[in-house]
């Protein structure tokens, strides 16, 4: 459904994540995420608000090859659902890390979502590797 003018109040515009059925990428759902303010972070975590991302034919390849190449492991979802990775830009909005400061921007691999909780490792002035256990072998 497309809307013009003001967005009706019944459309949630909070924190979300887009998921697809891994075996049928035409079937999608949007799940609501908790507010980043409600998250309990450890000292080695940070929250990156995803500001923009690109969606191209290449992202469909990520979905089609998700099981073969391991793309579904990057951002795990429940059951038969998966989260297709996208390239985008995000801003740190909360951090227990001394290396990642609130306001820092990062270009990287994200889910189609409002934010991502990361476990920064090997941080440099050029960026960082996400040390989350389920992404460890991939990133």
Residue ranges: model-predicted function:
Residues 1-12, 56-57:
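N-terminal amphipathic/basic-hydrophobic helices that include classical n-h-c signal peptides
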